[in-house]
Amino acid sequence: EDLARYASFNGILFHDDAVLTDVDDAGQDTTRQKSQLLIGFTRTLSQAVKNIRGPQIKTARNMFALPILQPESEAWFAQNLDDFLSAYDWTVPMAMPLMESVPAEESNAWLTRLVKAVAVRPGALNKTIFELQARDWAQKPQRAVADERLVEWMQVLQLNGIKNYGYYPDDFINNQPDMSRIRPEFSSYWYPDND
């Protein structure tokens, strides 16, 4: 409520910290209950914000890729793509192949597979923002994903019909990723439909 009252914004992103794992319950049959419980909690938070800022506030929720690619893994995350698509204005899958231990040379195919898994649901791509990784957290020490790789991933998404994508994190102080190199991939002019 304090955030809604004292800050100006148009939407809320519930990040990937909103999870309940398979050890946070009393049994296997509570998987769906956990998923619905977290959605209910975020709806309560959203409504508190909308009561102050108005009904135009948009909602989005991050989601791990695994529950999309392997729906049975909902038990590990309490995340379900179909539930998210109906509960939020936007669903934001973490399209982060390196974080999922996918070898770099297989990352383009992995992204394509993720897009196709979302696309089987009618209208889902119009409510989905794919979040690429700009940092490789698996490396020790952590380092930035090469600009060339990030651009390549953006092109893979575009070639698969994706119009809504972004990246995380943005290290603007160190210009990582380099804006001059990735900016062209945010233009809709190149997009295959040229829309």
Regions found by a protein language model. Give the residues of each.
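Active-site groove signature of glycoside hydrolases
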Residues: E1-T31, G166
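Alpha-helical scaffolding segments of alpha/beta enzyme cores, especially the outer helices
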Residues: D2, Q36-N51, Q79, D83-S86, ...
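Substrate-binding cleft of secreted/luminal carbohydrate-active enzymes
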Residues: N10, A87-S107, L111-T112, A117, ...
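Hydrophobic transmembrane signal anchors and adjacent membrane-proximal interface regions, especially
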Residues: G11, D29-T30, L37-G40, V120, ...
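Aromatic-lined carbohydrate-recognition surfaces of secreted/lumenal glycan-active proteins
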Residues: L13-D17, K34-A78, L125-W137, Y168-D170
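Substrate-binding cleft/loops of secretory-pathway carbohydrate-active enzymes
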Residues: D22, I57-E100, Q139-V145
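Alpha-helix N-cap and loop-to-helix initiation/capping positions
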Residues: D29-G40, E72-Q79, E105-R113, Q142-R149
